[in-house]
């Protein structure tokens, strides 16, 4: 299974759960610049308390997911990851903060075609500052 297929699987789950998201990090950078290989996917999500249990259950079958870590990080607006059991690709979920900047960044995200499906992609003007913030 290719990274593209893992991304599709994750995006379909997020859509089914009605969780707002945007692709970020190195995979998003590939849309705007010189493509490079990466073994993980960064996705910023805006998840509600009422969606957490369904989120965990949805990913639990095909992915390794630490439910305790998810619960801890969601309450602190941190990040957690899942790993597809059959294919070693890590997906980092970064919890969207409730700052004006982060809320506006979600409003600026773009819908792009990736093969035969669409994803929400961080805007280039938000991608660079996010990469700098996460590197600290």
Placement of each model-derived feature along the sequence:
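Compositionally biased terminal segments of proteins
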Residues: 1-136
């Amino acid at each position: 299974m290719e990274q593209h297929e893992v991304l599709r699987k994750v995006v379909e789950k997020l859509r089914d759960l009605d969780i707002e998201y945007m692709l970020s990090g190195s995979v998003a950078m590939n849309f705007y610049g010189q493509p490079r290989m990466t073994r993980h996917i960064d996705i910023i999500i805006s998840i509600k308390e009422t969606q957490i249990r369904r989120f965990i259950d949805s990913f639990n079958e095909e992915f390794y997911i630490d439910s305790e870590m998810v619960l801890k990080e969601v309450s602190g607006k941190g990040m957690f990851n899942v790993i597809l059991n059959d294919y070693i690709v890590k997906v980092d979920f970064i919890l969207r903060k409730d700052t004006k900047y982060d809320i506006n960044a979600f409003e600026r995200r773009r819908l792009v075609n990736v093969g035969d499906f669409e994803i929400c992609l961080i805007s280039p003007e938000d991608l660079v500052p996010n990469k700098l913030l996460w590197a600290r």
